[in-house]
């Protein structure tokens, strides 16, 4: 495998010294880029884009051609695992992902197959291999999965939800069924992420988009314990290097200590917590990723630079910070504003890495 020309992102996640703070953006390959829209039109639809290794590679690399990013992230979707389990994933215009065969009973859960990453999900591994080859060692490649709880919300609700009544009904009326589903999903995520690592992913991330809708005790019970199981089951070294793992739960500022205690290397932060507060609480255990409000990218360039400086100052000196947005970049953000953001991180962070 190629040696890395820029390993800042991996070093920061392992809390090792870097020259400047590394930066990437969640959803950095996406609809805010005109070249992405053109490639997606060529593919026909979103899942066809995900399933074509050459096109998935192309959209993964597009933001790296525009911006001085310190990592690439696999272009895929968090719902690949439930799709491979046969739930009939489809996308409705303006409504997001839906499943034609949602989970409604214990029998549905017992009958779920365990997808083989090199069979039903081989298209993802082919994309990882293609991207890794085409990156030519410029920056590391991040692989990812949804968390068991977040995957289960889509599988039981049948798509996106605001109230999560169906999954919470199962959680509180038939917890045994939900725990069986979450356990099966954790096993599948472990297989899936380890296959991505084998295929060339140099770091992995678990996105727990909907963990924040749970009470503190239910978060531990239905979300965090399964992410802990995943962390324990991951390949943590490959090709002579450590493979860092980052956990990201949206709206989880109150649970940082518990997340850090899983043994992960990095914790993703959304914008609802101050990074200095997060560092004071868990900075001696994990790296922190984040955490500018993605909507700040609508602001004037000077305002974006001010916000970057504020977050850098909040984290302060020393390693262990990967700069990112607090969630995915919005689809109508001007690409030039994203460039202001990325360049500002490198420009203003060097002063914090002189030691």
Swiss-Prot record:
It is found in: Cytoplasm. Pathway: Porphyrin-containing compound metabolism; protoporphyrin-IX biosynthesis; coproporphyrinogen-III from 5-aminolevulinate: step 4/4. GO terms for cellular component: cytosol. Keywords: Cytoplasm, Decarboxylase, Lyase, Porphyrin biosynthesis. The record marks 77 as: Transition state stabilizer. PANTHER family: METHYLTETRAHYDROFOLATE:HOMOCYSTEINE METHYLTRANSFERASE RELATED (PTHR21091), UROPORPHYRINOGEN DECARBOXYLASE (PTHR21091:SF169). Homodimer. HAMAP family: URO_D (MF_00218). This is Uroporphyrinogen decarboxylase.
